[in-house]
Regions:
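Carbohydrate-active catalytic/glycan-binding domains of CAZyme proteins
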Residues: 1-337
Length: 337
């Protein structure tokens, strides 16, 4: 796909991306209905593509389940299994108000699949109100299975809000395995504040995590709102993040205008910029000013020798306006060949 050394350049993936199709639609098209916030995992051996998603229907029926889809070509997906927040609440013994981001990886030692869920375990379901989103209590929970189709068994909380900087939110992870090491970039917010940063954690087994803290960006402190979401790849310079860079909150929703890539220097706790550019919509399904609602994946497809990028897109026609309970989100696929 190119003549460059090392990891295929994020600049080329970005420049060559072409809109392919809508992958998933929300459960309905009323404002406040979404799908997405998931993870694309490709099983090269079995020729299968697995995609997770969380459906949402407004402020009261927030992220009410995790859904797992399967495809044979990376473009046409069928629902295989799901787990509701009520079922999850029963299995972990704690009320789950909402499910958001999910991450799906396969553990190299056990061969089991790890499904990480961002769950709101606040005492009351108040964060559906755009004025009260910072009253939520988000942590990350792990489920384990022999196959992505389930059954999924609860393993326990793996990222708790036990640091000052993530006491309000420890969620919305980007988790991948590089050289046998789990690497995680996640959303960290101190309780009682509106300051959101991207934190870094590592693990040898995906269950016991070491939090390294809030990395600098090119040696400087992160902006007051700085959220990364995407994928982590093995590069010649070290682990490489590719995905969205979110700097804005619009009517309670973290909305994205930028695609970026960074070298993750976990030893020096720094993110070194490789590339950053404005994401300009190439489809009629993306809002012209805020095309993406935080979430995306950038994944190499070894089955078809191409790069797949999916985004959770803010629909410009069905949405009343960008915002927590006023927009409609779909999952879109871009292909770089």
């Amino acid at each position: 796909m190119g003549v460059w050394n090392g990891l295929y350049p994020s600049q080329a993936i970005f420049a060559r991306r072409r809109f392919r199709r809508v992958l998933l639609n929300p459960p309905c098209f009323d404002p406040g209905s979404w799908c997405g916030a998931g993870k694309l995992w490709i099983d090269e051996c079995d020729g299968e593509y697995w995609l997770t998603s969380r459906p949402r229907m407004g402020s009261e029926k927030r992220g009410y389940a995790v859904e797992i889809y399967r495809s044979r070509n990376g473009e046409d997906y069928s629902l295989v299994t799901w787990l509701t927040k009520e079922e999850l609440s029963e299995s972990i013994g704690k009320i789950v108000q909402s499910i958001e981001n999910q991450q799906l990886v396969r553990d190299p030692l056990s061969g089991k699949y790890h499904l990480y869920l961002s769950i709101d375990i606040a005492e009351r379901n108040v964060a559906g109100d755009e004025r009260r989103i910072f009253e939520s209590k988000w942590e990350t929970f792990l489920l384990v299975a022999d196959d992505p189709s389930g059954p999924w068994k609860p393993e326990g909380f793996v990222l708790r809000g036990d640091k000052d900087y993530d006491s309000g939110e420890a969620r919305d992870c980007t988790i991948d395995i590089v050289d046998g090491r789990y690497i995680c970039l996640y959303k960290a917010r101190k309780a009682g504040t509106r300051v959101v940063h991207t934190a870094l954690a590592v693990s040898s087994d995906g269950k016991n995590w070491m939090k390294l803290g809030i990395p600098t960006v090119d040696g400087e402190h992160q902006p007051e709102y700085f959220l990364l979401n995407g994928s982590i790849h093995a590069g010649s310079l070290g682990p490489i993040f590719m995905g969205t860079k979110t700097l804005d909150v619009v009517n309670g929703a973290a909305l994205t205008r930028y695609f970026a890539s960074y070298v993750i220097d976990y030893r020096s706790l720094n993110l070194e910029t490789i590339f950053s550019a404005e994401w300009k919509p190439s489809s009629r399904y993306e809002h012209p000013q805020y095309p993406i609602h935080t979430y995306c994946n950038v994944v190499y497809d070894p089955i078809s020798d191409r790069w797949l990028t999916w985004i959770e897109a803010v629909d410009p026609i069905l949405s009343r306006e960008p915002g927590l309970n006023t927009e409609v989100d779909r999952v879109l696929l871009y292909v770089s060949e």
